[in-house]
Amino acid sequence: MPENSTKPKVLVADDERVIADTLAMILNQSGFQARAVYSGEKALELAPTFQPDMLISDVIMADLNGIDAAIRIRALLPSIKILLFSGQAATADLLEKAHAQGYDFEILAKPVHPQDLLSKLRGVN
């Protein structure tokens, strides 16, 4: 069995490439198998084949916001754990909309400290 098959898979989505790449690198060095994508649409496209255990996504992205991407990915992968992060105030309205639809996503504020992120991820394993 390949070594990566036992590592939790994490899909990281952020339209700021440096953030997505940095988070994926930190996660890969911390015992996860992480892939970075740069849009909500790409996350939705990759999720069925990558089969992540967890999604970490920015909320505010141009093509498909992180909450809508999370809802659509959860429909494909019902057991996926979802952690959202944002540095923008507009997030509250989007979260309220998701809560009204029965989704209870956890959110971290940007900038995300790597230790805070790892603690959250290890808590959902």
Task: Tell me what each language-model feature is.
Residues A20, A62:
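The feature encodes the CheY-like receiver
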Residues F85-G87:
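Hydrophobic/aromatic residues positioned on beta-strands within the core alpha/beta folds
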Residues G31-Y38, L46, L108:
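Short hydrophobic/Thr-rich beta-strand motif most characteristic of the beta2 strand and flanking loop
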Residues F50-I56:
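Active-site beta3 strand of CheY-like receiver
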Residues D21-Q29:
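Charged docking surfaces used in two-component/phosphorelay signaling
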